[in-house]
Amino acid sequence: MNLPENSTQLYCEAQAAPQVVRQQLAANSERLERLGERLRQLKPHAVVTCARGSSDHAATFAKYLIETRLKVLTSSAAPSVTSVYEAIPNLAGTVFLAISQSGASPDLLATVRAARKAGALVVALVNAESSPLAQVADFTVPLCAGIERSVAASKSYIASLSAIMQLVGSWKADSALLQSLAAAPALMEQAWQLDWSAAVARLRFASDLYVIGRGLGLGVVQEAALKFKETCGLHAEAVSSAEVRHGPMAIVRAGFPVLIFAQNDETRDGVESLATELAGRRADVMVAGAQAPRSVTLPTISADPVLEPMLIVQSFYRMVNALALARGRNPDQPPYLHKVTETV
């Protein structure tokens, strides 16, 4: 599509994400201090997340962060258990973390209402502060992302990641995490300027690819795969660097595109090893956050490893916008999709 890359809503909204996070951290500081104190008193034995689409990818990030930092078991609720099967699990003594941009999907609302009746403390991360979800939750954490017009979420997804980090930092009273998070907006601005055009050139005519990561980066990998589908009409599958060995790597052939994200934590060595192995099979491997022989290295910003997935997705959004245009598509208007999706 013959449009400048900065003319799309996706570009403008993703570019605005650093300022969104900056404002969000300030606006929610006292609110999350109170919530953190409540959670320390409650001592929940588990967290249950509930979300759809990009918000569910943020929930994947929440699982890894909560379990690694707080050692609290975190699992994902399937809304259909309540909204379709009309079953209500016992959620006494748990935190039910609902994440949504619109806060309006009927299945999400039905599940949240059931969770409250089942004894959970409901915390909602939601962009629409006057939404039904915000009204039914025990605690609401505004995403503060403002109006998002592009069908493909960007700044609201990043705002979900930063809200999760601020929530966990406040719950644990983790000053180091909160200090790292305070530096995120400036680092995100740097990440936006990085040149990922090598990925655009390699994926312009692709029909399939894997997006691979692990641990704290898995939710960002899931988000990237969705964005390839939504904005580029490109079939992409998100898979962990461990899970890909349990069957999926059988389809990786010479020239098969593989985009790998890595953060500099305990998972990096394994991710790099996989990248090296796939490149050795002559797959077209692109790596962000690590290096491997015979692969293309996409530049990243080094930071606290917990921030690196968010910084990578900030760079990714600019690339995927350019890729959509290069493939002749309008990233703001994917076919058959609407901004607010309501499922039952």
Q: Residue locations for each model-derived region?
A:
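Composition- and surface-driven signal marking solvent-exposed, interaction-prone regions
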Residues: 224, 271-274, 312, 335
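Alpha-helix N-cap/helix-start motif at coil-to-helix transitions, marked by capping-box chemistry
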Residues: 12-15, 131, 313
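Glycine-rich phosphate-binding loops that contact phosphosugars or nucleotide phosphates
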Residues: 40-186, 214, 261-306, 310, ...
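Active-site phosphate/pyrophosphate-binding segments
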Residues: 5-44, 139-143, 147-257, 267, ...
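Generic C-terminus detector
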Residues: 3, 302-344
